[in-house]
A protein has these predicted regions:
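Nucleic-acid processing machinery
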Residues: 1-2, 9-268
């Protein structure tokens, strides 16, 4: 039901252009502040990204257009980097005998702008615009985790890994079920590129959220899902009967929403 609500909100955001400017701004802010974090909590990353981008487009139209234009202007160079970077990885994956596909992921417009603001840097100094995603079929279900690390070891022989930027979401899944191994490798041109290693199952969970998570897991209900229900009830209470300090309370709710997703990764 909640995932259907996220899809409805996503569809509604696409029709904002027909509304009055003040209505656009209100809905965009509401979407960015509540619905995008909720989509993230449900593991609906595609919808989360689109909600963020659509909200940003209506709240900051000039900045949105500027970043969109710069992404378009640099697309050819990114495609070239992607092909050159992944060619030896494909050869190595072929040697391993795994069924796989390799995709390019470009940082979203909202994420780029957000990083520009927090890091106080221009677009030209955002160096993680491109990420590479390796999606594979494990040899068998029991080897899924081992296959992730085997791929990591294999591609680390091709490119130098960044020792401080290994994120093991395989052994330590996020609260919304997300699993992947994130590594950062230095390409031949000296550029650091993030590589996300996922099985097809992990990718389904990343794309479809809890719907896919429970499809692969027998039974139902979990502590995390219970926490999500509590968060949703609290949000509903605030929206139904707003208090003078409702905005401050929403800040607290957003913090609590992600509290169970804090991990510390340290190099061995």
């Amino acid at each position: 039901r909640r995932q259907r609500q996220m899809c409805i909100r996503d569809s509604n955001m696409r029709t904002l252009g027909s509304m009055l400017p003040n209505k656009q701004f209100k809905i965009a802010g509401e979407t960015l502040y509540i619905y995008a974090p909720l989509a993230n909590r449900l593991g609906l990353y595609k919808i989360k990204t689109e909600l963020e981008n659509l909200s940003f487009r209506y709240e900051h139209p000039e900045e949105y257009q500027e970043i969109e234009n710069k992404l378009a202007a640099t697309a050819t160079e990114r495609d070239k980097v992607f092909k050159e970077f992944t060619a030896p990885i494909r050869a190595q994956m072929d040697k391993m005998g795994l069924k796989y596909r390799i995709l390019a992921r470009v940082k979203s417009i909202y994420s780029i702008w957000n990083k520009m603001q927090t890091k106080h840097v221009p677009f030209e100094e955002i160096y993680d615009l491109l990420a590479v995603r390796i999606i594979f079929e494990p040899r068998n279900a029991d080897e899924e985790l081992n296959d992730c690390f085997d791929i990591y070891v294999s591609i680390s022989k091709i490119y130098k890994p960044h020792p401080d930027r290994l994120r093991d979401w395989v052994s330590h899944p996020k609260a919304n079920g997300y699993q992947a191994l994130h590594v950062t490798l230095m390409g031949n041109n000296g550029q650091w590129i993030e590589v996300q290693i996922r099985s097809e199952r992990m990718n389904d969970v990343a794309e479809q959220g809890f719907a896919a998570h429970w499809k692969y897991k027998e039974g139902g209900g979990s502590e995390d899902e219970g926490e999500l229900d509590k968060w949703l009830r609290t949000i509903k209470e605030i929206l139904d009967d707003p208090q003078p300090d409702a905005i401050d309370f929403l800040d607290t709710i957003k913090l609590n929403l992600f509290a169970s997703e804090i991990f510390v990764f340290t190099p061995k």
